[in-house]
């Protein structure tokens, strides 16, 4: 059997790293500088898979753009947002590829992606995956921007829901609210993930308790954790949950919508979850790199009990259609 056909590409253990640090907000070039440094730092820490949070390049739109927004501030911010989006491929994305190759690591990073086809300048919320050889393995555009996100990003076409063979095994992923799109998760699970990457902009405050009346100030009841733990159990895979971090010091003093920012939930909270759905590391808060050692034996033991694509599946009763392949 080739390494490509083995769990975690035949490795007994993979160290993953979540880079939980603020980008240089709405500054693509300097954020790429920082990303390259952090990739090297994580690799020096023994990581083979390095993950950054949702739209880490070069910042999630944490500000409010209601109808009462100042039009001049809105135009200024939108120009910054547009001008600091990433083209794929480009000289900027090539720098990330070179950093991955130089450190010999697989990199997954969230970005604001600019679609620069002639006459098309839509932005997308994109997950970019780069192999340890510096090759772009794949990119996935978020299928459906959530709530007010629709004002910033277009809908992904959906033709990129694939799990990729990498040096650390089969890597798939989804972005934030896609984890409540049950069929999207089923699509990833059906392809056999070793690692599932889950990107979020922050650990949202929710209310807990039997009557949802207890405030959750530290985000420990963040609904993303429930989705990620369920996915780990169902997929028999490690889930790397990368949660965004930013603070007031990271926002430029001249940012026009500084007063309308909602960044209280962008405090980190990244975690790595074992195949049985139990947290392996985290949640961890603050500016740091979160490391976790992931042994292949955990996947093997999980699948010995529940193998969703094997003995625990009933394709004769239930099946999933992926429409882009129907149209191919």
Residue ranges and their predicted role:
Residues 142-156, 287-305:
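A short, polar/charged loop-to-alpha-helix boundary motif
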Residues 109-111, 125-129, 162, 270-272, ...:
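Short beta-strand scaffold segments in enzyme catalytic cores
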Residues 162-194, 198-200, 299-328:
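Cysteine/selenocysteine-centered motifs that mediate thiol-based redox chemistry or coordinate metal-sulfur cofactors
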Residues 1-49:
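N-terminal active-site segment of His-dependent metallophosphoesterases
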Residues 13-25, 126, 139, 169-178, ...:
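Active-site-proximal beta-strand elements of phosphoester/diester hydrolases
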Residues 86-108, 170, 176-290:
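CN hydrolase (nitrilase-like) catalytic-core segments centered on the catalytic cysteine
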Residues 28, 37-132, 202-230, 234-237:
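Cys-nucleophile CN-hydrolase/nitrilase-fold catalytic domain and related Cys-dependent amidase chemistry
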Residues 126, 139, 282-283, 291:
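Residue-level detector of high-confidence beta-strand sites
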